[in-house]
């Protein structure tokens, strides 16, 4: 299969999955099954697409267009200066204030187990 055919097949599968997903959300069980099977097909086609695209790139079939953006400018790194003593002293005092406050305890919410709606096994 050619790369274009594989891409078209992937698009068709994606459209099909999206269409069936809308139906499955409304409760259509057949559509949910189609979504599951189509997603498996899509996975296989995606693997094939990856293989074909790598092969095409190596052989030169896929040519990348040169970017229209200008190359990024290199920024000069500024030298780091030592922090001022006043800010260091302020940081120490803020730590002391935080340490003096008592830690408030939050009560964890208990999880309530809901009874299951499943029926028991029939004998």
Swiss-Prot record:
Residues 61-75, 103-123 have a biased composition (Basic residues). Keywords: DNA-binding, Repeat. Pfam families: Hc1 (PF07432). Coiled coil: none annotated. Transmembrane segments: none annotated. The keyword DNA-binding applies. GO terms for molecular function: DNA binding; structural constituent of chromatin. Residues 85-102 have a biased composition (Low complexity). Residues 54-123 are annotated as: Disordered. The keyword Repeat applies. Belongs to the histone H1/H5 family. HCT subfamily. Might have a role analogous to that of eukaryotic histone proteins. This is Histone H1-like protein HC1. It comes from Chlamydia pneumoniae (Chlamydophila pneumoniae). The gene is hctA.
């Amino acid at each position: 299969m050619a790369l274009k055919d594989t891409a078209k097949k992937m698009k068709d599968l994606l459209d099909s999955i999206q269409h069936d997903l809308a139906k499955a959300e409304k409760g259509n069980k057949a559509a949910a099954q189609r979504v599951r099977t189509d997603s498996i097909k899509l996975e296989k086609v995606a693997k094939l697409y990856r293989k074909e695209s790598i092969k095409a790139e190596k052989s030169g079939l896929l040519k990348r267009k040169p970017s229209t953006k200008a190359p990024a400018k290199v920024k000069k790194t500024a030298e780091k200066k030592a922090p001022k003593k006043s800010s260091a002293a302020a940081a120490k005092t803020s730590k002391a204030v935080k340490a003096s406050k008592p830690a408030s305890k939050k009560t964890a919410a208990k999880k309530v187990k809901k009874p299951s709606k499943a029926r028991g096994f029939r004998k």
